Each structure stands twice: as structure tokens, then as C-alpha cells.
Amino acid sequence: MDSYEYSELLKKLEQKIENIKNIIKPDLITKRLKEIEQLENSPDFWNDAKKAGEIQKEKNRLSRILEKFEEARSSVEDAKDLFEMATEEEDTETLNMLFEEAPTLEEKVNKIEIETMLSGENDDKNAIVTIHPGAGGTESQDWASILYRMYLRWAERHGFKVEVLDYQEGEEAGIKDVSFIIKGENAYGYLKAENGIHRLVRISPFDSNARRHTSFASVMVSPEVDDDINIVIEDKDIRVDTYRASGAGGQHVNKTDSAIRITHIPTGIVVQCQNDRSQHKNRATAMKMLKSRLYELELEKKRAEQEGIEKSDIGWGHQIRSYVLAPYQQVKDTRSNKAYSNVEAILDGDIDKIIEDVLIAEAEKESK
């Protein structure tokens, strides 16, 4: 890095800070935090424990955003002042130090930028994830199980909890279908970027001639809806089937006749749940899954209307990412148009950078 590149980076980071400031409005956050402080001092604040808990959660989130913003803003300002002084005095040692620290400074600003992007209406909700293999039998089913493990490891890295709702093993290897909830802060905000078709290219472990195969799997992510969100599902619009639970056994699933499959006839959406011995509980969970999927579909339609996207691009039917394991190793995301070579780490759940690059690319697209 040289002085010109560093000055260009500072301009870019200053612009980002300004954009973030316009979005989060620090003055309004400070005002709201003062209001919350007054509410907390009220003697009847804890009378409604649920509401008090929500306000505390809001306070923690706003305090964290404000703190990170101020830290990033002052870091950029300090770096700019030091750069101008070192340039004027031709202080090579200080300039080299600034150049070395440039990636850390950029990362700090990117982190608050991501935090800002995860302040949408549903971003703080838990995520319901369904992975379904594409055509291709064992190949695709094995790919679906690799993706499933990737998300489990991602959740583990974040300290998030996972609850398996439906797990159906493949006949030879992999899985036919899996649905699970990832519970944690901003789980949906992050994982909404995973909605779509994931493509794998590799030398098949199931091909005796060791040929290259391409496999596909769809990942569907929706926010776990709570009772505040009103989604009406009429009985005439659904078909409910019961079936015998089958899966990995043990911690994954109970082998009973209580598994439930619900088909939403108008949209063709199918949800399944078999994680409980009680058919009633499985039905309630399946209905919640269906509501979440329908809600996600509505969100997609609204986004499409705002962005003028063709209806055919809505939902989970478009390819978002390729994972190439042979003849070279690379993961490439079509939305950020960025490529990554640490394929092994990515498949082990190290996907934050990919997701963040997608969120940044989409935010930049919206701001144009």
C-alpha cells in the first residue's frame, strides 16, 4: 500500500461512516436511550415482565450499535489526522504503521456497517432453515448433508442453539430433507443471504471412474414468526398427512407414527415436522414453519416490487453460490461476485465473510 491508496481508503471509509450515520441516526438513538432510562426508573416498569424484557433487549442493541459506531468513527478520524501529520512531516515509520493497520481499520468499519444492515424488521429473529437436495440421487443428497453440517458448525461458532424439526436420511448416503431452527441474535439477518440454490462441483466419491459431478441443493430460510405476526391459513388451503418418522435416531428424531406433513395448496409449499412424539406438537410446529415460509414469501414479493425484480426471480429458485472442489478449489457467490479459496474452512462453517460481502454488495446496489 502507498499514500495514494491509503488516502483513497480513508475517503471510502469516511463515506461509509457518513452512510451509516444517515441510517442509524446516532442523535435519535441517544434520545431513545434516555427515554428507556426514564422508563427503567419508573416504579411500575417491571409490572409487565415481557414488555420490560423487550425494552431491555432494545436498549442493549442500541447501546451496542452506538458504541461500535463511535469507535469506528473516531478510529477513522484519528487515522486521517495521523496520516495528514505523517505525510506533512514525511514520517515514513508512522506511514508504514498506518498502512499495516489499514485492514484492521477497514474491518472495524465493515463490522458496524454489517450491524447496521442487520437492523431490519425481522433480522433479529431466529431462522428456520430447510435444505432439500436437487435431482441426482445420492450425489445431491450427500451435498445436502454437507451443507447441513456447514450450518450446524456456523451456529456452533456463534454459540447459537439448533433444534432439528425434520430429518430424513438418504437411502445410500446424505439426507433427503432436513429442517431446523437456528436460535440466536440476528440468526435470520445473517442466514437470509443463504436463500437459493447452492451448486457443488467435485470428483464424486460415489463414482468408481472418479469423474467430476455437479450437484445442486436448495436452501430455504425464513424468520421464525411469533404470535404478533398475523398470517391467516384457511383449512381448505392445506392438506395434512401423517407418516412414520424416519431419521438419524437418537438425538435427532423420535421413531413414532406422529410425523406431520402439511402442503399449502395455493403456493405448493410443503413443510414437515417429526421432532416430537406428540402428533399435536408436531402439527403446531409444522404450522409455525408454514407461517414462516408464507411470511418469507410475502417479504420476497415486497422486496421484488421495491426493486422491480421479475417475478420469476422471486423465492428460492435461483443459483446464488458455487462450491468447486475439482479441478481447483474455489467458492464464488454470484451476488457479491467474490471468490474465496478457503473452501475447507467454509464447509466447516466459516461463512461469515461470504455472508457479509453479500450484505454489503446488496446494500451498495440499493444505494445506487
UniProtKB/Swiss-Prot annotation:
Matching InterPro entries: PCRF, Pep_chain_release_fac_I, Pep_chain_release_fac_I_sf, PrfB
Post-translational modification: Methylated by PrmC. Methylation increases the termination efficiency of RF2.
Compartment list: Cytoplasm
Annotated keywords: Cytoplasm, Methylation, Protein biosynthesis
SUPFAM superfamilies: Release factor
Alphabetical list of PROSITE patterns matching this protein: RF_PROK_I
Any one of the GO CC terms: cytoplasm
Entry GO MF terms: translation release factor activity, codon specific
Pfam families in alphabetical order: PCRF, RF-1
Modified residues (N5-methylglutamine): Q251
Segments forming a coiled coil: none
Domain of life: Bacteria
Family recorded in the similarity comment: Belongs to the prokaryotic/mitochondrial release factor family.
Annotated function: Peptide chain release factor 2 directs the termination of translation in response to the peptide chain termination codons UGA and UAA.
Name listed for the protein in its UniProt record: Peptide chain release factor 2
Provenance organism: Nitratiruptor sp. (strain SB155-2)
